[in-house]
Amino acid sequence: MVTRRVDADQSVTNFGPTVIGRAISVDTAHTLSDMLANALQSESSGALVPGYRIAGKTGTAQIPGPGGYEENTTIASFIGYGPVDDPRFIVLIKLDRPTSSPWGSETAAPAFSQFVKRLVVLLEIPPDTIRQAAQAGG
């Protein structure tokens, strides 16, 4: 992405992002968020954060080398956001060549959970039940 241009006379022109449209509809975004959150809850994920409904996805990728993929090494990841009903953060955890396990679900997801447990305190995001009660006027 081009962010600036420097002309021969050293004058600089900066370019900001341009919104060209919506990638998916609001309804589709809500459906996808529900699917991601439900999948995490149903698999007793290490990414869960008590009191918060989180949406996210694990990833595990082989590492390419000159003669093919490296043996027994991966890039493990987890990307998640929340709270699902009013997202305030998105976090990506990426681990190159994790040693305890090659899987994102066993390495990056628990790291995400530990990070987000601290993040919700730092950002002063109340648990879902408290936020929803406040929104309902109670």
Locate predicted features:
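Active-site beta-strand/loop architecture of penicillin-binding DD-peptidases
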Residues: 1-19, 36-124
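Serine endopeptidase catalytic core focused on the charge-relay Asp
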Residues: 32
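Short, highly charged C-terminal tails/helix-capping segments
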Residues: 126-138
